[in-house]
Amino acid sequence: MPGITETSQVTGPVLAHVIVTEDPYDASERAFLSTDLYELLFEDYANGSKSGLTLISIQLMGSSLFNEFQTFKVYESEEQLPPNTVNLCNMGNIIDYSSDFTVDSGYVARVDSLVKLDTVIISVLPEVYSLASQASQHQLVDILGGNDQHTVIRQGDYNKDINGKISLCEPTDQGFLESTTKIIVVKENSLNLPLLDQSQDGSLNYEENVKMNLEHSISNYFSLNSLDPENQITTTGVEFSVKCLDSPISVRKTAKSISVAHDSEDESSPKLVEEDISNEDTLLYAFCKTTELAKIGCLSGDIVKMKSGQCQCTTFECNCESCPVQYRYIRIHAFTDPNTYEKGCIYLNPILSFNLNNPKIVKLCPISIPDKRFELQGFHFSKFIPLAKQVTIARVSSPVTLDRTLQTLFLTNLKTYFESGRKVLSKDQLIPIPVDTLLAKSIFSTYEKLGVDDSQFPTVIPEGKPDAIAWFKVTEVSGELADSASQQFIIDPLKTKMMQSGVVSCSPPKNSQHCNWANYLGCGQMFSFPNVSGVTTSTFEYAKTLRKLIKATIDPSRLVNLQTTVLLSSLSRAIGKSLLVHSLALECGVHLVEIDGYEVLNPSSESKTIGTIRGKLDRVVEGCTPLIVFIKHIEALTKKSEQQQKDSLAVKINELIDEYTAKPGVLFVASTNDSDNLSDELRAKFKFEIVLGVPSEQERTLIFKYLIDFDQKTTPKVTEGTRELSFAPRNDLSLSSLSLQSAGLTPRDLISIVENAKTLAVDRVESLAKHHNVSFENMVYSSGGYIKFTPEDVEKSINTARNKFSDSIGAPRIPNVKWEDVGGLDVVKDEILDTIDMPMKHPELFSNGIKKRSGILFYGPPGTGKTLLAKAIATNFALNFFSVKGPELLNMYIGESEANVRKVFQRARDAKPCVVFFDELDSVAPKRGNQGDSGGVMDRIVSQLLAELDGMSGGDGGDGVFVVGATNRPDLLDEALLRPGRFDKMLYLGVSDTHEKQSKIMEALSRKFHLHPSVDLDKVAESCPFTFTGADFYALCSDAMLNAMTRIANTVDEKIKRYNEELPEKSQVSTRWWFDNVATKEDIDVLVTLEDFDKSRKELVPSVSAEELDHYLRVRQNFEGGKEKKVVQENGQTEHFSNGSANNHITFGDEQVVEAIDENGNSIIA
């Protein structure tokens, strides 16, 4: 690596060599810089103009385990170090890897200051926790290094003094430990530490361990040196499982090919010669763990043979017919250690993998040429792969390659692809060319308006951000083939004649999680809609259905053309219908052409609309297979009309659908936000209709995981002198908590939440940097080089999204009413726990069809806390809350009222776990047949409500949805509502019948008051009658607070009056000035006294009279056992049964009859 030549001071990242050492005499962590690097980063310290503590932040390169910047103290510059070098001494987390550490470079940046840590959370094992938890805060700080004034604590480090892992640091991931830092010790069963090399007795002996591993590694590698003529390699190959890389891995270009040449003076002794391989085809680079190289018998950077069959067998020696074994020459590299890659696996780039038909297993063999090894002039691909004389490349027919507006850009990119190096190709190989479609269309439209011919388009085009792939296929390649099994040719742009002609039809490669070529080529990672099985349901069932339809349609083994047509619909916008089609098209390896109904619609002419559609689709449908024709917003073309006449445009579109789907392998998909507005003629044409709902809790968890992991996988690269701003979640961010709080939101809302959380995180870091007088850049380095968004940032973002879009999307919110706000209803609370807690904690008990009791009816006098209790249920169980009033459901149009009921329950299912609260239920579901409304709208609402309640009690559809009703008149309700399975648990909420309960209610209502020490709520309760409801006590406490405020205000007015009397008339002060300058704490502190409560109680009139309470008690007896029925038995005795629920069989002759006595004494015989 070249040394540093610049002399000006820089603060941005600088690429430098890294060495790791261990000092047996001084265990403190520290870093040393070479003299030139120290002068570059700390010029003001080097020339003596500044002194004090110096810090650096370094990100080690090459290993995925060191993807964050870590801050270290710099003791001094070291002249003995080579130029541009950092020496990390006693870095415990690095030393622990022993000989498995091969990182030798990293980006180094200057850090001027760190933040003082407020809190440090340490995770320890259970056997250590009992001892660590007993230590005082002062002892814990001393153990962590509190004696040192500038001890740097880093999140994720393992501290050997306390045998624990630093799990979390606040306010930043790295900072100074102070005596005031709060240390919290928590118990963890596993600390997720790196695998350490241990001696047989389990202790760590670093010196012996490093020495032993180093000697073993050196001897092992020299014995495997492919340049050693004495080494006779007899291996026939090693089998490896195949995995694909997620993103390109850069190979150091200083690693030139090591070749062997003879010394002119002594021909018998070979010497090493470096030859440039920077223009090689990197798609032939494969990677594995360092330990796997010993099995193959090669070094990192050697060329080996990779044999593979063309089947999907899991064993290499298969007996498949038409499966000739072929091999490729590849260059094998070892991953930088330490890493998390699997053993026994070879990692290929996805392009090479799908061109080999995605083999599951390959065999790697070292190249062995007996007696001619030292006649080779270099291990270049050109020594094994011949040069192609001529190559013919054809376009793969696809919507991208057939689009004229994109042609200039992808042909330019194709030329750049071959000019960038010596590519290696074989016949029938697919070549992907990334294209930025937005950039291409902009260039085309700009130059087309200027009247410029295609040949005059610019030859140098910006790279852009690719979002599509233009595929090309090698149809012919000619040259002197040295090995028929390889079929590889080198393409030299200066020597090989290249031709691009013709169009071929074939399917694109399948993009899967195991072979994600789209992400590898920079097109971004698309959400895959995984089908994960849960306790009762699976995630993204609609994606599973569409996936099956696509695979069945494109299956070449089917003899019958299915002519599949699918309509995707949703009740809400931004559900992800278009994303679903794009994702499954990539996954299944199908071409996709998409048009927007609003863009092709010509309201004035149906023929022009059809002509526009044909102009966009005819050529694509004719030339591409398999293909998905996707029209979004299809409702724009044919809307349902009130008239009973046929829609001529819908008829023509139906003819187009028949024409397109008549071709095998073509699938027609359309999407709409409201399928009911689609014309009946067109809707009837679709054989399958798939409804996309709002994501469930488990689905939202997967979406959040995708959004957050996606950001980490696309972390911007650090380049010398610059570092792009990147984001990452903090360790304590809980996806399950986020998914619970975001109930009812669409995927687009979830994306907005994550983006807003990033903005809030930036604002928080800027505010923190200003508060601690630290630069923003240093704050970012303190967090590992990322802007970390915290759970608080995401929760604020969720609340902002709900407040902003609650009216438009109807998003439910969790109310903030706790059990402490509800007083005197302990018995009712227990009943609620039995009804709601069991289905939520043990849903598996109801997965086999067992019906759960999900309906609760609160009834009783007004003001007894029915609505408050329903909100407390939602808060206590973290449920979303829907409140439904009767007038909200009524609509003047026939059928719309019932549709409103259906929408309420559908929204509840989308937002589950959820509570649907029907306030004043008697106005929503009165007895059927008693209303005189025209059309019987109330009867239909009740019938629809009964049907929805039956769906809620089932084991599948209503999982996580609970229905709560409240009414003052249960005698007016339809009897069908009160049967088991609907509102089957009736809870009476009456007035408090003891002074103790009354005291608990006032305690709950006044828990935020400042009460005078003389106030005894028990005494206040003893003076209250038993006719006071909860609302009356609320009025009592509110009036008492108002009396106290009035009393304080009058006292303040008197004080201001006396104060002004002592001043001259012209110097009178205002009330505001007096509060700002004269008032004391006693003047603004409102203390509620016993006199305030007495005055409020004397003025309060009960809202429910004693006679009304007696009426409600009679109603309660009616519903909870007051209807005792007498059953006459054969022996003449009478038994009492509640609600007539039990009858007795009586025998008269040979017949059995049932006789019951109703409450009026009448005999009933059935």
Swiss-Prot record:
One term of GO molecular function: ATP binding
A Pfam family: PEX6_4th
Keyword vocabulary terms for this entry: ATP-binding, Hydrolase, Membrane, Nucleotide-binding, Peroxisome biogenesis
Effect of deleting the gene: Leads to a peroxisomal-deficient phenotype with the absence of peroxisomes and the accumulation of aberrant peroxisomal structures resembling 'membranous ghosts'.
Lineage: Eukaryota, Fungi, Dikarya, Ascomycota, Saccharomycotina
Membrane disposition: Peripheral membrane protein
Subcellular location: Membrane
Primary residence: membrane
EC number(s) on file: 3.6.4.-
Quaternary assembly: Interacts with PEX1; forming the PEX1-PEX6 AAA ATPase complex, which is composed of a heterohexamer formed by a trimer of PEX1-PEX6 dimers.
Biological role stated in the UniProt entry: Component of the PEX1-PEX6 AAA ATPase complex involved in peroxisome biosynthesis. The complex acts as a protein dislocase complex that mediates the ATP-dependent extraction of the PEX5 receptor from peroxisomal membranes, an essential step for PEX5 recycling. Specifically recognizes PEX5 monoubiquitinated at 'Cys-6', and pulls it out of the peroxisome lumen through the PEX2-PEX10-PEX12 retrotranslocation channel. Extraction by the PEX1-PEX6 AAA ATPase complex is accompanied by unfolding of the TPR repeats and release of bound cargo from PEX5.
Family annotation (CDD domains): RecA-like_PEX6_r2
One Gene Ontology term from the biological process aspect of the record: protein unfolding
Recorded name of the encoding gene: PEX6
InterPro entries the UniProt entry points to: AAA+_ATPase, AAA_ATPase_domain, ATPase_AAA_core, ATPase_AAA_CS, P-loop_NTPase, PEX6_4th_dom, RecA-like_PEX6_r2
Any GO CC annotation of this UniProt entry: peroxisomal membrane
Organism: Komagataella phaffii (strain GS115 / ATCC 20864)
Catalytic activity: ATP + H2O = ADP + phosphate + H(+)
Family indicated by similarity: Belongs to the AAA ATPase family.
The protein's name: Peroxisomal ATPase PEX6
Annotated SUPFAM superfamilies: P-loop containing nucleoside triphosphate hydrolases
